[in-house]
Amino acid sequence: MKKVVSSLLIILGAAMLIFAIALPTYVVPKGKVLPKDIVSTTGTDPIKGNLLDASALAEGKPVSGKENLPECRGKDKQVSCFIWKDLELQSQRFTRAQEPTDDKVVTLEAGQTLFRTDRQEPKNLVNATVDRVTLDRKTQMPVADPVSTLDVNAPALNPNGEAAIGPFTRPGIQYQFPMGTDRRSYDYFDTQALKAQPIDYVGEEEQDGEKVYKFEQTVSPVELYPRLKEQLEADGDLSKADQSTLASLRLKFPAKVWGIEGADTKSAADSKDDKKKDGDKKDEKSPEVELSRYYTVKRTLWVQPDTGVIVNGKEDIWQFYAKDQDEADKMAQPENREKEMNNPKRTALYIPGAWNDESRAAQMDKAKEGLKTLKTMGTTVPWILGPLGLLLLLVGLVMALKRRRAERHANAL
């Protein structure tokens, strides 16, 4: 009987020691996978921003408070007459796991809305996107297959436009960082610019008692029309909705409607090489000028590195019209940007959004839940199993040695 007990203790103790070593070195790393039931909601508090009202522009009706301005009277009202300044805007994003999701991949669907707080649904909607991306559960990175899609609807900026992009291959992270985030740059995919570029690690901070990594990214002005057109044409066909969406990204008005005067008038007209057919009539004092919409953003994210959960975020988003890349870059310079913010003449959308307290708390709770699991499996359980396994192993060995001595003594007699 003692032989059986000692053998069992040795086997059990050895197994516990092996498991204690294997948990933090093999099992936990292998277990760092995204869950299949991801659900999260993040958003901003109401924040003042600027917005070009496409419906008001189409109707030629200035927004409230600008009706009596000199530039907002008569036939050729300036674009500035249709831009709301200091309008309360709010953003919200709901992310959840969808099919296909299995042991290897999880598909995330993120529905994001930007709306104005002074109107009731559905007239309050500025824009909405539904973004779908499939991630490798082990690496937390997008899969290499062309399975990502993006649906865009922006009634405030284009009442008739709704575009569907994809399927396409998604480069870069977006809603989740790797579990075990490093202090380095990562490629981050921007759904507006439709491309990935580095988001840089800038330092370590603390949030709600936990270590977080801070990442920053500045997307310099990028023209939206060419990239979106390329994506929409990927399937070889442009729908009427696609064409309408693209049309809103390049607007053509007389120079005076854009507020362009003097020497800038000819420069703006020439920049697009706007050739006229012989016999066409044109207003030499205010020629037709086509401007294209550009997008720039300053993005800041805070990430809990062990879980890869994004626990806080800020995005300073600005869309505006410019004649070319050079002018767009000049408009984005601090002094010119501030001037445009104070007196918007070319702005399509500006919102300096930051996550609200509820979003930060909810995401940190998710990170802490993940940390608790990692700590339990990687530290707590091994610390219990290790000493206990060693104790059982020693007891078993001692019992075995005593039994053998007793047997030798009995044989000697």
From Swiss-Prot:
Compartment list: Secreted, Cell wall
Keywords (A to Z) from UniProt: Cell wall, Ion transport, Secreted, Signal, Transport
Signal peptide per UniProt: 1-22
Segments of this protein annotated with the region Disordered: 265-288
Keyword Transport on entry: yes
GO cellular component: extracellular region
Function: Forms water-filled channels that favor the permeation of cations.
Family of this protein: Belongs to the PorA family.
The protein, known as: Porin PorA
Species, as recorded: Corynebacterium resistens (strain DSM 45100 / JCM 12819 / GTC 2026 / SICGH 158)
Upper lineage: Bacteria, Bacillati, Actinomycetota, Actinomycetes, Mycobacteriales
Gene name of the record: porA
